[in-house]
């Protein structure tokens, strides 16, 4: 839903109110006002749910990107230290080779 829908609904409500006053039929005026209130509430609820959905999608995207970056950082960090530990264990003589 777009804000234009709310504007159209408000204009229709004003038009319906003006026409109902011309007709001098209070039941028609009440019926139209009730209908327009219901239509306005439905439009507002739909707009709110769309906005909440967009916010939820952005939050999920942000969390996914953050966890992906953290995972990449941990993999890089682990890779650097794994290479360090492997080279350190190869350079260090074992106690069995000192005995010979």
From Swiss-Prot:
Predominant cellular place of this UniProt entry's protein: secreted
InterPro entries for this protein: Apo-CIII, Apo_CIII_sf
Modified residues (Methionine sulfoxide): 63
Region (Lipid-binding): 68-99
Compartment(s) of residence: Secreted
Keywords assigned: Chylomicron, Glycoprotein, Lipid degradation, Lipid metabolism, Lipid transport, Oxidation, Secreted, Sialic acid, Signal, Transport, VLDL
Annotated tissue distribution: Synthesized predominantly in liver and to a lesser degree in intestine.
Extent of the signal sequence: 1-20
Sugar attachment sites: 94
Protein name in UniProt: Apolipoprotein C-III
Native organism: Canis lupus familiaris
């Amino acid at each position: 839903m777009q804000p234009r829908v709310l504007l159209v609904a408000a204009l229709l409500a004003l038009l319906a109110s003006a026409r109902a006053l011309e007709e001098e039929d209070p039941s028609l005026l009440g019926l139209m006002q009730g209908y327009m209130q219901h239509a306005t509430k439905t439009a507002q609820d739909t707009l709110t749910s769309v906005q909440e959905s967009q916010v939820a999608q952005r939050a999920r995207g942000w969390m996914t990107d953050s966890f992906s970056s953290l995972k990449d950082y941990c993999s890089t960090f682990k890779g650097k230290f794994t290479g360090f530990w492997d080279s350190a264990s190869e350079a260090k003589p074992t106690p069995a080779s000192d005995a010979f």
